[in-house]
Structure formats: structure tokens, C-alpha cells
Regions:
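Short, cationic low-complexity segments
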Residues: 153-170
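A glycine-rich beta-to-alpha transition motif near the start of alpha/beta enzyme domains, typified by
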Residues: 1-130, 143, 166-168, 173-295
Length: 295
């Protein structure tokens, strides 16, 4: 059975996200996601972004915008009901810049709160539409699991990799690895090992970080839609990496910049009484016009 839906394509720091504007039942998320991820929006619909500048624009993930009831915050479900920081800040940008739902602050900045799958509380965003920039409060980790490099079979590649941390961001868990080369084969082995120890996670990522350059290569698996991607950038993984860096710091405010395959993300953490109290994440983004598609 065919259906017509309206979508927009978002480019939050290269983590290309398709937003479905038409209300869709949750049980249809998987089928629609599978269809949308096959479409080249650059070649078929003329979508073009400045960074990365490519004639091909393929989605990496799909978010479904929820119908709003009176008094409710704007909301979004990711296709696997996971959490995604890049999708969340792009959704907040769409709500403020395109629908006028933000509250004005000084200097042309707007703020609003949203709700999202994989996070049990609202998140607050700051939007600068003229600068194509959005910052969002990130959820704090709900659990931390420590592995050794030897336990993960990585000691031969990096003998200095003593402690590795799996950071559970509630809707997605990320393994943070320094100075380990990324590959799908390695990712599959790491996922198998982590799942054997921690159970089957809804969504799992490995953040492969070159410690000298702070270049981060994100690989993410979402169980319910069975997708694995080398992502252009990963916001929740970047926040998890910043959290691990913050574990090494004294109380204070610290900023970290992580370059990624298709964009750069910026994080700020605040540490108080030996605990990380806040994480925010920001970066550039772009949106396409509304596109109507027959599936």
C-alpha cells in the first residue's frame, strides 16, 4: 500500500537526518525508514548542502515528528526510539527557525524545550537561525561500565589503552576508544563483546578518537531498524567522549572540539563537587525545503 508523506532533510554537522512531518504509527517506522534511507535526495530531489558539498545526499537516520497536543512540548521519535543529539538539535532548530516556536533572547538567539525518544526529560536548545547554529543541553549518562583494553582485544594495537568506558546516555550507549583505528569488522567484534557483558542495547556506538588531533570517527548500530553506519558526526557520542575527558578534570568549565568525517561538534561540560553537572553540544546545521514523497 502506497502512502504520501512530507519530509525535510536536515544536515546537523554532516549527520544527515530525515524528518517525517506526516503523522505515522510507530509500527510503520521500520518500513518507512528502510524506504527513506534508500533515496538519494541530492540526485532525486536536488537537495544540496554546503558542508559536505556533495551531489549525493543520503540519510543516515530518520526521525518522526510527533503530533502536538495542547500544552505539550514539540516532540520527536527516532526510528528505533533511540536518542540522537544531532537530530534533537536539528528538530529544535526547525521548530524555532521554521515554525516560530522559540522564545527570543538577546542577540537574535532563541530558546525552546523539546521532548525526544530515548530521553526521559525535556531538553533545552538555543538557536541562532542567522548563523545556522544550534546548541542543545545533553542528557547526563545514567550508567558507566569500565572495560580494559586487553579485555576488548585491543591491547596489541594500543598498549596504553588501559581503561575504556561504555557511557550509557539512556537512549544510546557509546564505547569511547582512544587511538584505535575504525573498521566495521572491529566494530562488530566490540559490539558482540559488549552485548555479552551488558545485554542487548537498543543502540550502540563506538567513538574511535585520534587523541592527538581529536578527530572522532563514529560508528553506530540501532537494533530495532538493524542499521550500522559510519556517521558523518555523532552528537551523543561526542557528549560521551567529552564526559570521559571531564572525568580527568578538576571542578570547572571545559570545552572540547571534535572534528568528524563530515562536520565539527563543540561540547562544554561543567564539573561541580567532583561530578559532571552539565553537558551542552553545538554545531552548524542546514535544512532542506519540505519534500513530498510517494512510498
Amino acid at each position: 500500500m502506497s502512502r504520501k508523506i512530507d519530509i525535510i532533510v536536515a544536515n546537523p554537522a554532516g549527520n544527515t537526518t530525515i524528518f517525517v512531518l506526516t503523522p505515522v504509527p510507530v509500527e510503520e517506522y521500520g518500513e518507512i525508514t528502510e524506504s527513506l534511507l534508500k533515496i538519494d535526495f541530492g540526485k532525486d530531489f536536488g537537495v544540496r548542502f554546503t558542508c559536505p558539498d556533495s551531489e549525493s545526499v543520503m540519510g543516515e537516520q530518520v526521525g518522526f515528528i510527533l503530533p502536538e497536543s495542547e500544552g505539550e512540548l514539540p516532540g520527536i521519535n527516532m526510528s528505533g526510539l533511540e536518542f540522537c543529539g544531532n537530530a534533537s538539535r536539528a528538530f529544535a532548530y526547525y521548530q524555532a527557525a521554521c515554525l516560530g516556536k522559540g522564545t527570543p533572547l538577546e542577540g537574535g538567539v532563541e530558546t525552546l524545550s523539546i521532548r525526544t525518544s530515548g530521553c526521559s526529560h525535556p531538553l533545552t536548545a538555543r538557536i541562532d537561525a542567522k548563523a545556522n547554529f544550534a546548541e542543545i543541553q545533553m542528557p547526563l549518562p545514567v550508567n558507566i561500565t569500565k572495560f580494559s583494553g586487553e579485555e576488548l582485544g585491543l591491547a596489541h594495537e594500543n598498549p596504553n589503552l588501559i581503561d575504556c568506558f561504555l557511557i550509557d546516555m539512556d537512549g544510546i550507549s557509546h564505547l569511547i576508544l582512544d587511538n584505535i583505528t575504525a573498521s566495521l569488522e572491529k566494530f562488530a567484534k566490540l559490539r558482540k563483546h559488549v552485548y555479552e557483558k551488558c545485554g542487548s542495547l537498543d543502540a550502540f556506538g563506538v567513538m574511535f578518537i585520534d587523541r592527538e588531533s581529536d578527530f572522532l570517527t563514529p560508528v553506530v548500530y540501532v537494533r530495532d531498524v538493524n542499521t550500522t553506519y559510519f556517521e558523518g558526526s555523532c552528537a551523543s557520542g561526542t557528549a560521551a567522549a567529552a564526559f570521559v575527558r571531564g572525568m580527568e578534570k578538576y571542578d570547572g568549565e571545559y570545552s572540547f572540539t571534535f572534528r568528524q568525517p563530515a562536520g565539527t561538534l563543540y561540547t562544554t561540560i561543567k564539573k561541580e563537587s567532583g561530578q559532571i553537572a552539565e553537558i551542552s553540544l553545538s554545531g552548524l546545521l542546514e535544512l532542506s525545503d519540505v519534500i513530498s514523497i510517494e512510498l
